[in-house]
């Protein structure tokens, strides 16, 4: 559970939250229909699970077309690598997306944030909020990219 992982951050281990959002998913559903939208969600979810395989890491659907990935005991470099691997893996699925004004295929935007071992005031809400803010920046900067809010994770 994410709360258990956050407690681990308080005990001297880093914790990262990676928010993943499918770009222009409403347009995908509008163009292809909800059954294809559901299939797209399932394919993206599998790509996330395949990209994140370390013990203790979690992948979950957060709502709508958003997913959350919790990386336990990861360095900043490992978080960045995992997020970029997720982005590239989804793009490599090459799922056609006629409703995407930029890429013509399904892509994701990713925001990441870290709870540092020394952050005694970390909370699940704050960590998710920071990752969501980073996701917003990724979308504002053109989508299909990773945006880190902090670079202070340490194992």
Q: Which positions does each model-derived feature cover?
A:
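Catalytic-core segments of nucleotide cyclases and related cyclic-nucleotide turnover enzymes
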Residues: 72, 76-84, 101, 115-155
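Conserved long alpha-helical elements within nucleotide-processing catalytic cores of c-di-GMP signaling
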Residues: 2-16, 23-50, 60-64, 68-72, ...
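HATPase_c (GHKL) ATP-binding subdomain of two-component histidine kinases
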Residues: 69, 106-108, 112
């Amino acid at each position: 559970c994410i709360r258990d992982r956050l407690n681990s951050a308080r005990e001297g281990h880093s914790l990262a939250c990676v928010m993943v959002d499918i770009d222009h998913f409403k347009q995908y559903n509008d163009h292809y229909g909800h059954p294809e939208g559901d299939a797209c969600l399932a394919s993206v979810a599998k790509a996330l699970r395949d990209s994140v395989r370390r013990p203790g890491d979690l992948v979950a659907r957060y709502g709508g077309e958003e997913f959350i990935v919790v990386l336990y005991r990861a360095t900043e470099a490992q978080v960045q690598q995992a997020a970029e691997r997720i982005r590239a893996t989804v793009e490599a699925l090459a799922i056609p997306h006629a409703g995407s004004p930029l890429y013509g295929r399904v892509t994701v935007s990713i925001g990441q944030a870290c709870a540092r071992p020394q952050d005694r005031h970390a909370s699940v809400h704050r960590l998710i909020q920071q990752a969501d803010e980073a996701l917003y920046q990724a979308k504002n900067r053109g989508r299909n990219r990773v945006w880190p809010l902090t670079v202070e994770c340490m194992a």
